């Protein structure tokens, strides 16, 4: 299949990022966005038509000068797939948007929220988001905003962090 080599390439890029970029304090924003694109494409293949996905990321060339801490954005995207896509239901959705402006970068992730399905029973409190919040407190103390809230049938995460050049 033509997609198998593409998948292997995306997976190898993800692994390379985890091995060689994650130990750095700051990385170019476009590197983080490339990892998100690869991760999302792998998940799209996994879920197929059960998932409606909308992703709006800025052009990578414009972002190479901006630096952020690695894996901050990816953690919220992973969480959306973990809790926002149902194995049983077909009306799952995820929206991801990144916007860069005036020394800041914002990530908005909106994902479907399911009531009482086997997909989310017992998974209300995980350590993933708590670890990301602790990381934000260490790296961006008093310089970030994080809003997480339920809005109807969706869970919304909005994060704003400063970028350095």
Listing of model-derived features with the role each one plays in the protein:
Residues 162-165:
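C-terminal end segment of the histidine kinase catalytic
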Residues 1-158:
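Two-component histidine phosphotransfer core
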């Amino acid at each position: 299949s033509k997609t198998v080599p593409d998948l292997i390439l995306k997976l190898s890029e993800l692994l390379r990022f985890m091995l060689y970029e994650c130990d750095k304090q700051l990385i170019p924003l476009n590197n983080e966005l490339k990892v998100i694109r690869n991760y999302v494409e792998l998940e799209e293949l996994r879920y197929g038509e059960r998932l409606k996905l909308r992703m709006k990321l800025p052009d990578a060339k414009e972002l190479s000068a901006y630096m952020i801490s690695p894996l901050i954005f990816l953690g919220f995207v992973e969480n959306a797939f973990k809790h926002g896509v149902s194995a049983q239901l077909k009306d799952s959705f995820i929206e991801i948007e990144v916007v860069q402006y005036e020394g800041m970068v914002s990530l908005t992730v909106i994902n479907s929220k399911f009531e009482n399905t086997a997909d989310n029973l017992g998974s209300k409190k995980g350590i993933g988001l708590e670890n990301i919040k602790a990381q934000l407190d260490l790296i961006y103390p008093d310089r970030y905003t994080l809003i997480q809230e339920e809005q109807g049938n969706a869970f919304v995460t909005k994060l704003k962090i400063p970028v350095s050049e």
